[in-house]
Swiss-Prot record:
The modification Phosphotyrosine is found at Y132, Y133. One of its GO terms (cellular component) is cytosol. It comes from Rattus norvegicus. The active site is at H11 (tele-phosphohistidine intermediate), E89 (proton donor/acceptor). The modification Phosphoserine is found at S14, S15, S118, S135. The lineage of its organism: Eukaryota, Metazoa, Chordata, Craniata, Vertebrata. The gene is Pgam2. HAMAP family: PGAM_GpmA. Interconversion of 3- and 2-phosphoglycerate with 2,3-bisphosphoglycerate as the primer of the reaction. Can also catalyze the reaction of EC 5.4.2.4 (synthase), but with a reduced activity. InterPro entries: His_Pase_superF_clade-1, His_PPase_superfam, PG/BPGM_mutase_AS, Phosphogly_mut1. This is Phosphoglycerate mutase 2.
Length: 253
C-alpha cells in the first residue's frame, strides 16, 4: 500500500540540448521549447491537484527555472526550495560544449559511444585550458566545495555516487516524515534516484532516458519502495509519446 508520493521532473529542453551539445555543468538557459515543456508539465501537476511541502533542485538555471515555472503555475511559490550541486547534471569534462559531430570527429565514434553508454567510464577531464573551465570550476556557487568534491569529469556511476548521499540524508527522511516532495533536476541525477528506488541494474539504468519536462509520479511504501510503476503526468498524447520514448531506449538505433 502506498503511503507516500514523490514527484520528479527533468528540466525542459535547454539551448544546448537543442544544439545537441554536451552541457553538463555549463549553466545553459531553457530554450523556447524547454520553457513551453516546463509550462506544460506545470499545468499537468496543477490539473492533478498535487501540492508540495518542500522542493529540491540543482544549482543550474535550467532546472531552477523549470521548478519556478511549476511553483508559479500551481500557485505554490512560497514552498521552501533547497538547491544543491549534488543534483547537478553529470559533468561531461572535456566534452563540455562540443556537439556529437565535433566529438566524433575529434575522438572517434566508437570512443564517444563508450563515453555515452558506459556506466563507469568517464569522459576526458576538463583541464584549465578548456573554454569553460573558469566559468564552471571557478564559479562562486561551488566555492564551498572541497577540492576532492569538485569534479573535472564524471561517469554516470560518479554522478550517482554524489547524488545518492543527498537523497539518503536529506530527501528520504523528509518523505518518510510525510512531506510531499518535488525534485526538479537533470537526466543523470534523476537516473540515480530511479535506479535506487527500483533496484535497477547498471545496464538497465543506462538504457533509461527520462523525457524532458514531463512530471514523473512515484507511489511509495513506508520503506520508500515503489508500489506501482512510474507514472507520467500530462495529456494522453504527451504521456503516450513519453512512454514510447522510454520503451524504445534500449532498442538498437
Amino acid at each position: 500500500m502506498a503511503t507516500h508520493r514523490l514527484v520528479m521532473v527533468r528540466h525542459g529542453e535547454s539551448s544546448w540540448n537543442q544544439e545537441n551539445r554536451f552541457c553538463g555543468w555549463f549553466d545553459a538557459e531553457l530554450s523556447e521549447k524547454g520553457a513551453e515543456e516546463a509550462k506544460r508539465g506545470a499545468t499537468a501537476i496543477k490539473d492533478a491537484k498535487i501540492e508540495f511541502d518542500i522542493c529540491y533542485t540543482s544549482v543550474l538555471k535550467r532546472a531552477i527555472r523549470t521548478l519556478w515555472t511549476i511553483l508559479d503555475v500551481t500557485d505554490q511559490m512560497w514552498v521552501p526550495v533547497v538547491r544543491t550541486w549534488r543534483l547537478n547534471e553529470r559533468h561531461y569534462g572535456g566534452l563540455t560544449g562540443l556537439n556529437k559531430a565535433e566529438t566524433a570527429a575529434k575522438h572517434g565514434e566508437e570512443q564517444v559511444k563508450i563515453w555515452r553508454r558506459s556506466f563507469d567510464t568517464p569522459p576526458p577531464p576538463m583541464d584549465e585550458k578548456h573554454n569553460y573551465y573558469a566559468s564552471i570550476s571557478k564559479d562562486r556557487r561551488y566555492a564551498g566545495l572541497k577540492p576532492e568534491e569538485l569534479p573535472t569529469c564524471e561517469s554516470l556511476k560518479d554522478t550517482i555516487a554524489r547524488a545518492l548521499p543527498f537523497w539518503n540524508e536529506e530527501i528520504a527522511p523528509k518523505i518518510k516524515a510525510g512531506k510531499r516532495v518535488l525534485i526538479a533536476a537533470h537526466g543523470n541525477s534523476l537516473r540515480g534516484i530511479v535506479k535506487h528506488l527500483e533496484g535497477m541494474s547498471d545496464q538497465a539504468i543506462m538504457e533509461l532516458n527520462l523525457p524532458t519536462g514531463i512530471p514523473i509520479v512515484y507511489e511509495l511504501n513506508q520503506e520508500l519502495k515503489p508500489t506501482k510503476p512510474m507514472r507520467f503526468l500530462g495529456d494522453e498524447e504527451t504521456v503516450r509519446k513519453a512512454m514510447e520514448a522510454v520503451a524504445a531506449q534500449g532498442k538498437a538505433k
